[in-house]
Amino acid sequence: MLRQAKFEDAQAIQNLICFYSEDGKMLFRSLEEIKQNIAAFRVYEKSGEVIGICNLKYGWDKLVEIRSLGVDPRFHRQGIATQMVQDSIHQALLNQDCDTVFVLTYAIHLFEKLGFQIIDKINLPQKVWNDCQQCLHQDNCDE
């Protein structure tokens, strides 16, 4: 079941973020940061367990970023990430200040399958790059 994250989900969200951030596939987010931004997270819950996460970041020139998308590896290839991306697009476009949804990702095939197009990051506003300063790959970005 896909739903809005609750404060009680913060630790489960961080656990998935830590799993993916260990090998540089996702930016680390502290538990405090997650709690402060819990309203921006959506989770996929199965049998009472958070097995998927996604975060939307609003705010740059009518752009919305899908970020911190991750699914517990035990549940890969079941369409959960696809559902979460489709839900994120829907949520983002409900906001009248949004006309473009983007993502910086290694999961290129997933997003192309869902209609996203590859663009050069240079076309994104400089403000988008703030998170890049925390990334392990900032000097050799391959997203």
For each of these PLM feature ranges, what is it?
Residues E33-K46, N140-D142:
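A short helix-loop-beta-strand connector motif used in the catalytic cores of GNAT acetyltransferases and
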Residues A39, D97-C98:
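Short, high-confidence coil segments that cap the C-terminus of an alpha-helix
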Residues T105-D131:
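Conserved active-site alpha-helix within GNAT-family acetyltransferase domains
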Residues V71, R77-A92, V103:
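Conserved acetyl-CoA-binding loop-helix of GNAT-fold acetyltransferases
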Residues V43, E49-Y58, K62-G70:
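Conserved beta-strand in the GNAT
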